[in-house]
A protein has these predicted regions:
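Histidine-rich, glycine-flanked metal-binding segment
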Residues: 1-58
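C-terminal helical cap
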Residues: 15-16, 21, 97, 249-251, ...
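Divalent metal-coordination and catalytic microenvironments
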Residues: 16, 31, 53, 64, ...
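Alpha-helical scaffold segments that flank or form the walls of functional sites
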Residues: 54-56, 60-62, 71-108, 114-131, ...
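Histidine-centered catalytic micro-motifs
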Residues: 59-70, 195-203
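Active-site core of metal-dependent hydrolases
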Residues: 142, 146-148, 161-266
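His/Asp/Glu-enriched, well-ordered alpha-helical/loop segment
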Residues: 195, 216-220, 269-348
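C-terminal cap of metal-dependent C-N hydrolases
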Residues: 337-407
Length: 407
């Protein structure tokens, strides 16, 4: 991986397995898939990567990261919010998420208050340094926006948009006037043509109904999360709330791996109920080793695993919640392993999606037609010589790369 971030040469992914069971070659030219054919049928003048033993998937995306506080859980005392410190942490966090497969990250950043715009400055610097490796979008999240105390927050939010924040965030649960807070966010977003991402626990049906009614129809769209409080509503109330969210076209972002800064409640909303009502549900990581979750991993495949194991989704639906559906919620182009689609891909060692979600150790990540990250794992067992061979003890390792430079 010695190419500069801006370069994209021809690339052939050979012998990969798709979720439908086919073994294929995938030829990539620039940032898009040029051709898909039966394994062994395609050639290239560029680099060939041997993906025998790997499952090839559309790359996931991260809809809810906290870049300004990431990797601060072990800090002695309050974490630094100096731009240079935030830039370093945000860069490290985004690269960790990239190694897991996320080629796009929506990063929430607090603005205003004692920190001012320093954390946003750091995250925007990280975005620039990561260009060509991953797409990092900053969400400016204010605290108060109403009353005398909210004037500074509203000014900071406007300044954040001028600096380059790509999404307008909000925290209506933290404002004495949640409706006024939401109205201020939506007005600013409409004026600039930006999407909205609101932090809410979703445990107050009346408040959520007002918020949903206000947000409905806004383009390019509104996300709400983590909405853990929805799981605490009585069944009929939860069903009515789900119907309102679906009618408004609002996306619910759940965090199955844990909590995040600013959320009072832990847990996951009723994912199957929301999906049955027609709500678009996506899954994110939330806190990444900060005060809210000191053991956060930032791994979208773990989020998918938890949706499958804890929420009863099929492996396919669970993975779509961190990949295709998330990309749609973030306004990103759709990805399929077909000619003409963006070359945003994740190869995971395994022969099926369920196995990949369970034991997704070795991974290869492709962003804009380039291999941008590799993680290789080898599993071995201590044996007693011939007995190991006789019993066929499993070993996970890298396939023979051959002369063409496989993984």
């Amino acid at each position: 991986m010695s190419e500069s971030p801006g370069e994209a040469s021809a690339l052939l992914l050979g012998g990969a397995r798709l979720t439908d069971g086919r073994a294929v070659d995938v030829r990539i030219a620039g940032p898009r898939i040029e051709a898909v054919g039966t394994a062994g049928s395609l050639t290239t003048s560029g680099t060939r990567v041997d993906l025998r033993g790997y499952l090839l998937l559309p790359a996931p995306a991260e809809p809810h990261a906290h870049a300004d506080t990431a990797l601060t859980g072990a800090a002695a005392g309050p974490p630094s919010h100096r731009p240079e410190d935030v830039r370093r942490r945000a860069t490290e966090a985004a690269l960790l998420q990239l190694s897991h497969g996320a080629t796009a990250v929506r990063a929430h950043v607090r603005v205003g208050g004692v920190e001012g715009l320093g954390p946003l400055e750091g995250v925007l610097a990280a975005r620039r340094s990561l260009r060509g490796l991953t797409e990092l979008t900053a969400v400016a999240v204010p605290r108060l926006l109403t009353g005398v105390a909210g004037a500074d927050g509203l000014a900071a939010l406007r300044d954040a948009v001028d600096m380059g924040a790509g999404v307008i965030g909000g925290s209506p649960d933290l404002d004495p006037d949640p409706a006024g807070h939401t109205e201020a966010v939506l007005e600013l977003a409409a004026a600039h043509g930006l999407p909205v991402d609101l932090h809410t626990d979703g445990d107050d049906p009346a408040r959520l109904a007002r918020l949903t009614a206000m947000a409905g129809g806004l383009r390019p769209g509104v996300c709400l999360g983590p909405c853990a409080g929805l799981s605490r509503l009585p069944g009929e109330e939860a069903a009515r709330t789900a119907d309102r969210l679906a009618a408004a076209g609002v996306t619910v972002v759940c965090l199955p791996q844990g909590c995040c800064s600013g959320a009072r409640l832990r847990g996951t909303p009723p994912v199957r109920l929301l999906r049955a009502a027609g709500v678009r549900v996506v899954a994110g990581s939330g806190a990444l080793r900060d005060g809210a979750n000191p053991v956060g991993r930032g791994d979208p495949l773990e989020a998918a695993y938890l949706l499958a194991s804890q929420e009863g989704l099929s492996p396919g639906h669970a993975y779509d919640a961190v990949s295709g559906t998330t990309r749609a919620a973030l306004g990103l182009p759709g990805v399929r392993v077909e000619a003409g689609f963006p070359a945003e891909l994740l190869a995971v060692r395994g022969d099926g999606l369920a196995g990949a979600l369970s034991l997704a150790y070795s991974r290869i990540v492709v962003h804009r037609g380039r291999v941008v990250a590799r993680t290789s794992a080898v599993r071995e067992y201590r044996d007693s010589g011939a007995a190991a061979s006789a019993h066929g003890l499993p070993r996970q390792g890298r396939t023979d790369s051959g002369p063409c430079g496989g993984p």
